[in-house]
Amino acid sequence: MFEEKASSPSGKMGGEEKPIGAGEEKQKEGGKKKNKEGSGDGGRAELNPWPEYIYTRLEMYNILKAEHDSILAEKAEKDSKPIKVTLPDGKQVDAESWKTTPYQIACGISQGLADNTVIAKVNNVVWDLDRPLEEDCTLELLKFEDEEAQAVYWHSSAHIMGEAMERVYGGCLCYGPPIENGFYYDMYLEEGGVSSNDFSSLEALCKKIIKEKQAFERLEVKKETLLAMFKYNKFKCRILNEKVNTPTTTVYRCGPLIDLCRGPHVRHTGKIKALKIHKNSSTYWEGKADMETLQRIYGISFPDPKMLKEWEKFQEEAKNRDHRKIGRDQELYFFHELSPGSCFFLPKGAYIYNALIEFIRSEYRKRGFQEVVTPNIFNSRLWMTSGHWQHYSENMFSFEVEKELFALKPMNCPGHCLMFDHRPRSWRELPLRLADFGVLHRNELSGALTGLTRVRRFQQDDAHIFCAMEQIEDEIKGCLDFLRTVYSVFGFSFKLNLSTRPEKFLGDIEVWDQAEKQLENSLNEFGEKWELNSGDGAFYGPKIDIQIKDAIGRYHQCATIQLDFQLPIRFNLTYVSHDGDDKKRPVIVHRAILGSVERMIAILTENYGGKWPFWLSPRQVMVVPVGPTCDEYAQKVRQQFHDAKFMADIDLDPGCTLNKKIRNAQLAQYNFILVVGEKEKISGTVNIRTRDNKVHGERTISETIERLQQLKEFRSKQAEEEF
């Protein structure tokens, strides 16, 4: 497999292995006719014999491997010299270049360490454990808990699954990268497809491959040789022709699988202790709808079967919290094929949407932001000025109007630049904080659309701060305080990362240094823990990335604080400084707290599991009459709560018992259930209980409304308890 974002460099793997691959000779001796019969459990059986390309590929590989081993042996004999390997604690270990491997050094420390190490890191670059060291270097030994080690572990697992897919389906493998939680592999099949019924037989074959402890081997090969090796696979040839710009590149082998890959990988397939195939879908080659349709299979793996059990439990919990399911069950929102990627918010979903916007709007007033309204459609000349047309036009909805090209806006910043520039500006106006809830559109591929998390139509709590260079620190402090206020109301903890100047940046290095220093000062004064992502900033300015943690431990990036030195230059934005200089350039701070309102609703839906806090709940109050004689009073009660701007409903179903009505309201997640009978009717009261069946007893209507208004205004997280 070969991914543009794969880790590098890759490495040669040691370990004993049969010359052709475990089980291969036996497989080749099988009958001439391919057997595609299903396995006993209804899945698909392994092909017998394997596709011819596997044997041809292996023959070429074995010749190249013999040449490679000969060259490496000669290099180890002639060029080897003593080197120093520096460990993280500063200790130095003696080694020999072209001979000593990271695995050998790990064994020298302890066998337990060697066994638990997933991958090495040499001079800050991930490196195969069995690949010889080449010079003096630093060495880290990464375990599965490390994010880079997880990526390698799942990458190797993808190769195991890829081998099984070739042996079962016989198609052409495409991309197969590690992803945030696991891995996938795409395969092109000329006929037929993948079924979830195949998973058990695929998993069984993966377990067999794992049991064989097939070594991962790395080989650097000339591009033209690889074009011959992969001539059966037009997708690999496309990768070689379109993405490989060097005379050579690398392949990895495990068993009969040989694939284009930068690597690195675990030592052998036996390092994967638990593997599960859990999902399949179809996709397009490189996500382009006019290209071939591919079959994608997803998997997950761990170094301990207990971890897989925990993952399965977590998946079940996540499934129960899926915002698409809850949105359906609670009648909040839905999607329709006639407007893909654009959500229909039903009345109760619209309440949540508007409550979030009003929350942010109320904070804007406190914090000196001014809300603006900008057009949805702009001439393409605007996007050419901003630079988005050159880099982002494929993701924009564009159309012709009177022989001019226009587009729906995918972001607000260029429009805000026009707003800043429509008249001369003075230093007295800065910082100028412009906020916009405008509708945005991005042309996401239909196959990538996923509920509310990936949409085409959305709104953001988008704001741009135009400020002087010396004002950056205070503005960033304000942004950080803003996000802490909002996230504490939701009950989210969060992580902060400062991303600094990348290698390819625009602007003056002095300006970058000054801005980064102000960001650091702001973060330090903010008082929350933060980490440095050196070199990970955008080319136009440093940024602070914020990830929130939900109720089941998942992280989501919503908020962003991004400095921009380039957009003011592109739009030639200036202001008159206090010393009379009318060519002073402002800095733009892009910031959002919710990010996409749609995506935040998805996160909140799953975080709360549909059990909304009172202020945000679309079902705040349910009035339940004891019997028909109390229906009229119940309707009056419901109207009073409605007039007080609560989401209040009434259950007048004569076919339900009182207990059934109360239980229905609790299951529907009404925060407060107000029971009214003859006693309450006479006294003008309500009897209050919560969705968790906490009974607060009898209160007057006015007293209840006043208390609920307080809880709503303060956005209490536990209103039912605090009542």
Curated annotation (Swiss-Prot):
Residues modified as Phosphoserine are: S39, S702
Q: Which residues carry this modification: N6-acetyllysine?
A: K243
Ranges where the record places region Disordered: 1-46
Give the protein's recorded name. Answer: Threonine--tRNA ligase 1, cytoplasmic
Task: Report whether Plastid shows up as a keyword of the record.
Answer: no
Disease (UniProt): Trichothiodystrophy 7, non-photosensitive: A form of trichothiodystrophy, a disease characterized by sulfur-deficient brittle hair and multisystem variable abnormalities. The spectrum of clinical features varies from mild disease with only hair involvement to severe disease with cutaneous, neurologic and profound developmental defects. Ichthyosis, intellectual and developmental disabilities, decreased fertility, abnormal characteristics at birth, ocular abnormalities, short stature, and infections are common manifestations.
EC numbers listed for it are: 6.1.1.3
Activation/inhibition comment: Inhibited by borrelidin (BN, IC 50 is 7 nM), which binds to 4 distinct subsites in the protein, preventing binding of all 3 substrates.
Give a Gene Ontology cellular component term annotated to this protein.
cytosol
Q: Where in the cell is it found?
A: Cytoplasm
MF terms from GO for this chain are:
ATP binding; identical protein binding; threonine-tRNA ligase activity; tRNA binding; zinc ion binding
Major location (coarse): cytoplasm
| Processing and modification events after translation | ISGylated.
Q: Which UniProt keywords apply?
A: Acetylation, Aminoacyl-tRNA synthetase, ATP-binding, Cytoplasm, Disease variant, Ligase, Nucleotide-binding, Phosphoprotein, Protein biosynthesis, RNA-binding, tRNA-binding, Ubl conjugation
Task: Locate the compositionally biased regions of type Basic and acidic residues.
Answer: 14-39
Task: Kindly report, in one word, the top-level EC class recorded for this enzyme.
Answer: ligase
Catalysis performed (reactions): tRNA(Thr) + L-threonine + ATP = L-threonyl-tRNA(Thr) + AMP + diphosphate + H(+)
Task: Give start and end of each TGS domain.
Answer: 79-143
